Amino acid sequence: MEFDFFSFVAPSRVQSLVLPFGRVRRKSFSSYLQLLRRVSHIQLSDVPVATATRKSSSFNPLAFPLGRLVYNFLTSLDDQQALLEEFEYFRRVFVLIGIVDGSEEQEVEQLCSTLDVWRRRIPHALVAKCIVFNCPEDKENIFNAPNIIIGPRSDFSINSVMRSILCDITAELLEGFSSLEFSIHARSVILSPITDMPHLAPLQRKNSNASIHSLGSSSRPTLTRTPSITSRSVNSVTERSKSLSKGRIENQFGQLYLLAGRVPNALKHFSTAIALSKATGDFLWQGLSLELFTVCLVIMAHLHVDVQIPPNILSMFPSYNDRLNAFGPLKFDALLNFITEMRNVVDQLYQKSTLQPNDAVPGLCFSESILRYAHLLTVVYSCKGFNDNALDHIIAQAPIRPVKKATTYVPNKATICQWIMRAQGQHLNSLSIRERCRIYGAMANMLGSIGFSRLRVKMLRELVASLTPVLLETRRQNASKNGIHPEVIASHTAQSFKSTHYCNILPLISEICQEYGLLKTDGSLLNPELTKWGWSNLQFDVLNELISLCDSLSDYRSILLLISLFFLTSVQTASSSQQISMFKAFRKTYLFASNAGIHINAPYWDPFMITDLKFIGSSENAELIHQRLRNGLPKSIEKGPFIYNPFNRRQDQNQSKSVLVVDEQVAFSIYFRNPLSVSVEVQDVHLETKGVSAKCSHSTFTMRPLSIERTTLTVTPTETGELHIVGCRVKVFGCEPILQYVYEAKDKHKSLHVYLEKSKDVNAELRSLDTIDHLWTYFPFKKDLKTKSFDCIVIASQPKLSLAFQNLTSGKFNFAEYETGELVYVIENTSFVEASHISVLFEDSSSKAFEQAIADKSITADRLYELQFEEFNLPTFTVESSQPFSLSPGERREIHIKIRAKPNSQEGLILFESSVHKPEDTEFYVRRLRIPVSLNISKRVDLKQWSAFMDTEGDPSYCLVLLNFYNHFSEPLFVTVKTASTDESRSVLIKPKADNVILFRLKRFIMSSEEINLDIPNLSTKQFVLSSGFKKSIEDSYTMKKRFWIKEYFLKEVQASWKTDDNLHHGEIYLRNHILSDEMANNLSILPIRIQAWVSYDSEKVTTVCPREPFKLVLEFFGHADTNMRYKISWTQLNTQANTSSFNGLILDGPEEDIVCFNNSKCHVVIERNMFAYTTGMYNIFVRIFNEELQLLSQPVDLDEPILLIVDAK
């Protein structure tokens, strides 16, 4: 590999230009060049000395056999370095080598001619040779020329032969150095570099004399300030130049010996040059000599040769006198500190040289000198000390071995950074673009080595800013020469890149983008929401700079990538104007590339383009399809420790999948977001599916700025199985088609997170073009986000029903409350599959009212029964036959549906369920045809009041019932009341907005106490928590149950209906909403046992008896009972209002209580009891009968009215 030009020991390397001569393939030339670079270090002990000692022994290699001559093989020539060759010899090309491929057909005369041309172009080259590689033996005699050398073949020891060839070249080079030494010695005047050239502008004077302290030394040498030489005559300048030439000649001798590997001789000459230059005030050459002296010290340290510092140099650094003059091993720490002190002096000398206009240091030389020393510090920092590892890398550019712990002094990063940044200045603006880019590149490389990635990228931005206008100007000049527009040149340049790999600038672009938070190699992005200090503006400026660079190179693909990257990372913080300008550039670049025949696309910038995906079913609104799975047999449940496990249920719910039908189209609603302030054109979008094959529709639309757009896409499965909708394949204008997933909303914020740490060891990765190209092909982001997919099960073709006819037009149907009617529908099987099972189901809004009513916490048991009765026994819709039927393809069937208009059933739904399955199938699918029905319900006739009275004819078995009806309608209505037991009907005409009464006799209901004590039934099979009102009604006693059961008997016996005069409308009158009072309940019912009693005297009924005369109390019991009953007699004297006993008032012959025996055949029992009165007065006699066994739970029966008995002596 080529040596680093900014290495600290770069002045000790001989520049050798290697060129291909004749017909040489690129790959062969690279391999031959690699062979030369393998043996670039030539030991002086291996160089033959006969030729070198012919004239002089000054460059005899055996004088210092430990020395090495190092070649730096170049493949290009920099003509701008020629003006500095006399100042720094390491810039001069001393060796010219032409590589010839012996396996190709070559012409020797042409090779020699080419070599002569290059010798004339490089007149200072001391050696010019052609090396023929891989030459067959039979062709060796062809290349018989003095300047042509036969190189190694594949069957030879390649390294040995190459080293032998270079040793011969080195011997000839040393002979040339001897001649050059004599010519230098013969010179009378040696001038400093000409700084009048624009690219060799002198260093500008700085006000600060900052220097870096060495470790352990607080003293710094003080240099005497010399006034600037502003004006001198020609003669005086000439005399001064002559006086300065002695020191400069010694400096050039030292440079030659340094290049020749004779380091001790170079140290001697540099020491002399320092002394002479110091005496004459030649600051430029004194600084150069002192700088090269430090290079010699580093080389000697690598050779482990002790060095004795000359006294004139030690006098400049008194603190190092004892440490550096002692004999023994060289101390690395002391040497590094000493070099640091010398480097400070060199820097001051170069600064002082700016006061001498004719001898000022060129800005290029100063920056390179600074960077060479900074490179030394960087290597020491990387090797954790100035040790053998660091020296091997500095001298031979060997790989740096890992070191766990620092054993010597390691300069800190801040110190190294200060030295690197001192190479920057205004003088760089006057350098040529090549030298300027080389300076900025070296600074960026060193800053990256110490971990200052932000400053490294800053230098890369300076490099881009310097390179872009030069490239644009070059394009303009080429277009001006050819007389065409510069855009045509750009188009031709871009077209020439179509078939080649043109991503060479991507590593540079990628690194800059990474450092400014636009892209990271690990896939993370910088979240700009947490960087509020103008970060987005900085990113915008950086991208503009990179886009300008790509534009100057006609790299349209990189322009599109950069703009897409800007939209990806800065969309949340970029201003509207920035977004609009970027999108205009994106559109212009894409259209220009397309017109030029270059088809390139950038990755789309928004990975979360889809915000939601919803299933909306069939695209035909008239036929809403609902598919569900019916399980014929219950699935077995695994035994577990829990009675109910909610997690299992949640898992089952999550595993539920929608069901699709083969060859039936379904639609999805997809919501796309556009976070930009510009309109984005979606050229194509369709659903992305996995699993079974399906046909997907395509769509195109435009997303408005800062909006969420909704579009509908359809999919038609073509076979049975599982179908997964994973997202959408979207093609945006100028972008690659990308699969957009649907992500969980809670995980989207994880895709962007703050990444402000410094990058570590990314340079090696960035050098790989494959890595960079893959990185820019798809924008990376967090891959651990959860995606959502719509999973479906595709089943075989299913029957499809449609409504062919209905007897009423669409709209609301007008009905009165509880009016009955009939709806006629004709359904047709429009599919090619037979519907083997078709059933009719109904839904209406009264169910919601029922659920709301039963949710009342104060609802009682009887009210709950009324609601359940209306919900379950009085459905809104009924069908004549509830048995399933079948329809063949194309067949029609007429369905008659009866309707009962309940008050809360304004909205209804008729469902025709169709399916195809065999009787033995346990699982099948059904499809519902939904027909909505809207009812407009109004009041017609309702019961305003009801009452029951005792029969006026005195028959206790009958009562009178009064029903008061009110007509809400605008026409007269006929109301009919019918009794079920007698089948009698009573009708009355009720005028509009008026009421009328119907009065009729009704036989009273006989109810036993057991029937009354029955619990109020619950018609619902569902289990629910009893409300407080329901519990209270259950615990309530006899009254509520008696009222409930009597009402039930009454509603079974009495029905009321209404009809119009034309008999077109009719309906029933709902009577359950009215409450039955206790009085009405008693009048409507009679108990199963009745008591009649009277007083008998001489077999006649009397009400008055005489005292002390016996009379009879006759008790007559009617009814039946399954068990024995017990009666009780009691009386009360009215004048005293106190109960009496058998000892005062009245006397009973026996006990007051006795048993009455009933059986099925004995329904009438008469009992006579003898009594007499011995006290006059008025008495009320009471009789009560009750159950003998269950007295506490039985309801006693009393005499209807107490017997009034008058005892009077008269």
Swiss-Prot record:
Q: What is this protein called?
A: Transport protein particle subunit trs120
What is said about its interaction partners and assembly?
Part of the multisubunit TRAPP (transport protein particle) II complex.
Tell me which species this is from: Schizosaccharomyces pombe (strain 972 / ATCC 24843) (Fission yeast)
Q: Summarize the protein's role.
A: Component of the TRAPP II complex. TRAPP II seems to play a role in intra-Golgi transport.
What the entry lists under Pfam families is as follows: TRAPPC9-Trs120
Q: Which GO terms describe its cellular component?
A: cell division site; cis-Golgi network; cleavage furrow; growing cell tip; trans-Golgi network; TRAPPII protein complex
Q: Describe the family membership recorded for this protein in Swiss-Prot or TrEMBL.
A: Belongs to the TRS120 family.
Write down the InterPro entries for this protein, in alphabetical order. TRAPP_II_complex_Trs120 (IPR013935)
Q: Where is the composition biased (Low complexity)?
A: 214-233
Q: Which domain of life is it from?
A: Eukaryota
Where does it reside? Golgi apparatus, cis-Golgi network
Does the record's keyword annotation contain Transcription? no
Q: Provide a GO biological process annotation.
A: intra-Golgi vesicle-mediated transport
| Main location (coarse class) | Golgi
**Record keywords:** Golgi apparatus, Transport
Q: Which residue ranges does the record annotate as region Disordered? A: 211-243
